[in-house]
């Protein structure tokens, strides 16, 4: 079954954004650190995309985080593939005072949008918006694992659940 690219783009972006948050450090460091620090590197994983007609499709993703201009910013690249196709999303993520914000673009379909969210005790909550995309995401960080859940609004897609592993 072919999924709409808007849904796949949203799902991939959701993964990226959700992965962009980690919990605050447990020990008091001498210098301020960012909850984004633990994200730097490569994450891979898979999950399922739920569709309103009751079907689901397997999805595999690779997410790479590179430090940007400051310790509170990251550049992110997300590549996901399913039977319905593939996407590539690039994002710029900023952390400030417990909040996450930024922008994203899907390179092959020329889609763009914004993200905004907050840090939670176990990860973060984020809202992803774009011209034809609205989604709510929750991310739970547990050591080298990220569990990402995305709920799509006004879409033929219901949601996306992914498990990513750092390495």
PLM features: residue spans?
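Bacterial N-terminal signal peptides that target proteins for export
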Residues: 1-12
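Bacterial N-terminal signal peptides
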Residues: 10-20
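Signal peptide processing junction and immediate N-terminal pro/mature segment
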Residues: 21-28
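Preference for long, well-ordered alpha-helical segments
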Residues: 146-148
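Central antiparallel beta-sheet cores of small beta-barrel/beta-sandwich binding domains
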Residues: 28-140, 152-166
């Amino acid at each position: 079954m072919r999924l709409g690219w808007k849904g796949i783009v949203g799902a991939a972006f959701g993964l990226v954004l959700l992965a962009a948050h980690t919990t605050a450090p447990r020990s008091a460091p001498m210098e301020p650190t960012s909850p984004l620090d633990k994200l730097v590197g490569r994450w891979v994983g898979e999950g399922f995309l739920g569709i309103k007609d009751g079907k689901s499709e397997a999805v595999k993703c690779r997410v790479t985080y590179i430090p940007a201009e400051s310790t509170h910013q990251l550049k992110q690249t997300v590549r996901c593939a399913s039977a319905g196709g593939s996407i590539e999303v690039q994002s710029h993520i900023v952390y400030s005072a417990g909040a996450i914000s930024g922008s994203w673009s899907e390179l092959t379909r020329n889609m763009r949008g914004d993200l905004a969210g907050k840090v939670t005790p176990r990860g973060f909550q984020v809202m992803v918006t774009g011209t034809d995309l609205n989604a709510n995401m929750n991310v739970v960080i547990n050591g080298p694992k990220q569990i990402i859940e995305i709920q799509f609004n006004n879409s033929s897609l219901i949601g996306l659940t992914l498990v990513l592993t750092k390495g």
